[in-house]
Swiss-Prot record:
EC number(s) recorded for this UniProt protein: 6.3.4.2
Descriptive protein name: CTP synthase
Biological-process GO terms, alphabetical: 'de novo' CTP biosynthetic process; pyrimidine nucleobase biosynthetic process
Enzyme superclass (EC): ligase
Annotated positions binding L-glutamine: G352, L380, G381, M382, Q383, E403, R470
Quaternary structure and partners: Homotetramer.
Source taxonomy: Bacteria, Pseudomonadati, Pseudomonadota, Gammaproteobacteria, Enterobacterales
Gene Ontology molecular function, alphabetical: ATP binding; CTP synthase activity; glutaminase activity; identical protein binding; metal ion binding
Residue span(s) of domain Glutamine amidotransferase type-1: 291-542
Known role: Catalyzes the ATP-dependent amination of UTP to CTP with either L-glutamine or ammonia as the source of nitrogen. Regulates intracellular CTP levels through interactions with the four ribonucleotide triphosphates.
HAMAP family given in the database record: PyrG
């Protein structure tokens, strides 16, 4: 089987939406019966985004196999059925790290190690490895053409086009076509300059995606085609839309998938986008709306919680309601009190690291529990709910996590490797287990209790969800908390670790150690988010009586 490659680049400005455009095109090709995957090549020197600030980079998306990756991989999984893995995302830092390791081992036999050919060869090897077994691979190059950081990646894909052959490679370039209000027209010159920049490094784009706040007129597209040496039918207008799920239909209506299939000599049926039409219909025809408060510490950049925000919207689609998300800084809860949480239909506390704002999250969990407000805690959101219950219901004053207070009296949450037994001795778990040292990453099994709410929601006794955390519930202190009324609703496959907790005498109080947002999609939703949004609607109705 021959694999075909579509290399996606961006020009003029960043944040044009390369990831969404690539994912939308992949969705159309998948709807034609093709086996499609998408890769993201990031030019930054960090080995992966795992240690990067969410305020700078946005969320870290965790794949099934435990890779910490760019948030664009979340878009890819929400648009296509193919699951991403560590092969779908790599950085300049990862490439240099691999090459330097080989150089130290002597793999290059004393050669002078250079960007060309050693770095570019390493990039090509990873792209080819990631594309194995697929009909079409879309490869998104991060950054903007002209950035010094992107040059090795652009050189590598130029070489790939020569080596694989132009009959199996396409270059798709996204560019900005701005509207000048003073002139009353769109301007094509930035696009021409961007293509000129690409040509200077040996890449002739085959497809141009023209991003604008309005449809680019046919005469302007013809002008772009003429000056950029691209067929007119391959100049695609991609205007701003109110829903990203309209983009597959927008690209298909301009024949982009037909053009690509002809170029690659692929014989495949017409794309059936009925599932996407259903998503658009559900989004456009809500029967009501709810307001959900999300209490976190990175709220100045909503992309830090991208998958959670999308998953809440998916939960709205499944309940035919619009979800209005109110982002609340947990430090504001500390300084202004829980009064700022009034008038919410439900409360969600997402994952996070570090002590800043934690007491505000603990106060939020207490407010939701005591006032019967639907609550969903994710990762740290589960840990603060447990700490709150231990303090205020189980009589464990000053209970905390060793992440925040290492020598606290009741360490109800502790590092995976540092639980204390009943005699006060530190119990160390095996580092050889799949928990992986200090960070638990990737998809793992969870067994649900038959009498739990989550068992009803999932409709299955065993689930698989993705993790990203260092700290766990301390089993040695669990009996006292359970005796006070907290229910452990789910445990890890080996029955060792607490995965889900519930408050039984509450309309809807669920908190999980894993990240359910990473497996939610617009077409299928997710049981926890669908149930949470439904609970928000029911709470709203109760309050209205």
């Amino acid at each position: 089987m021959t694999t075909n490659y579509i290399f996606v680049t961006g020009g003029v400005v960043s944040s044009l939406g390369k990831g969404i455009a690539a994912a939308s095109l992949a969705a159309i090709l998948e709807a034609r019966g093709l086996n499609v995957t998408i890769m993201k090549l990031d030019p930054y020197i960090n080995v992966d985004p795992g240690t990067m600030s969410p305020i700078q980079h946005g969320e870290v998306f965790v794949t099934e196999d435990g890779a910490e990756t760019d948030l664009d991989l979340g878009h890819y999984e929400r648009f296509i059925r193919t699951k991403m893995s560590r092969r779908n995302n790599f950085t300049t830092g990862r490439i240099y790290s691999d090459v330097l390791r080989k150089e130290r081992r002597g793999d290059y036999l004393g050669a002078t190690v250079q960007v060309i050919p050693h770095i570019t060869n390493a990039i090509k090897e990873r792209v080819l490895e990631g594309g194995e077994g697929h009909d079409v691979v879309l490869v998104e190059i991060g950054g903007t053409v002209g950035d010094i950081e992107s040059l090795p990646f652009l050189e590598a894909i130029r070489q790939m086009a020569v080596e694989i052959g132009r009959e199996h490679t396409l270059f798709m370039h996204l560019t900005l076509v701005p509207y000048m209000a003073a002139a009353g027209e769109v301007k094509t010159k930035p696009t021409q300059h961007s293509v000129k920049e690409l040509l200077s490094i040996g890449i002739q784009p085959d497809i141009l995606i023209c991003r604008s706040d309005r449809a680019v007129p046919a005469n302007e597209r013809a002008k772009i085609a003429l000056f950029c040496n691209v067929p007119e039918k391959a100049v695609i207008s991609l205007k701003d839309v109110d829903s990203i799920y309209k983009i597959p239909g927008l690209l298909k209506s301009q024949g982009l998938d037909d053009y690509i299939c002809k170029r690659f000599s692929l014989n495949c049926p017409e794309a059936n986008l009925s599932e996407w039409e259903q998503v658009i219909y559900e989004e456009a025809n809500p029967a009501g709306e709810v307001t959900i408060g999300m209490v976190g510490k990175y709220i100045e950049l909503p992309d830090a919680y991208k998958s959670v925000i999308e998953a809440l919207k998916h939960g709205g689609l499944k309940n035919r309601v619009t979800v209005n998300i109110k982002l609340i800084d947990s430090q504001d809860v500390e300084t202004r009190g829980v009064e700022i949480l009034k008038d919410l239909d439900a409360i969600l506390i997402p994952g996070g690291f570090g002590y800043r704002g934690v007491e505000g999250k603990i106060a939020t969990a207490r407010y939701a529990r005591e006032n019967n407000i639907p609550y969903l805690g994710i990762c740290l959101g589960m840990q603060v709910a447990l700490i709150e219950f231990a303090r205020n219901v189980a009589g464990m004053d000053n209970a905390n996590s060793t992440e925040f207070v290492p020598d606290c009296k009741y360490p109800v949450v502790a590092l995976i490797t540092e639980w204390r037994d009943e005699d006060g001795n530190v119990e160390v778990r095996s580092e050889k287990s799949d928990l992986g040292g200090t960070m638990r990453l990737g998809a793992q099994q969870c067994q649900l209790n038959d009498d739990s709410l989550v068992r009803q929601l999932y409709g299955a006794p065993t689930i698989v969800e993705r993790h990203r955390h260092r700290y766990e519930v301390n089993n040695m202190l669990l009996k006292q908390i359970e005796a006070a009324g907290l229910r452990v609703a789910g445990r890890s496959g080996d029955d060792q670790l607490v995965e889900i907790i519930e408050v039984p005498n509450h309309p809807w109080f669920v908190a999980c150690q894993f990240h359910p947002e990473f497996t939610s999609t617009p077409r299928d939703g997710h049981p926890l988010f669908a149930g949470f949004v439904k609970a928000a609607s029911e709470h709203q109705k109760r309050q209205a009586k």
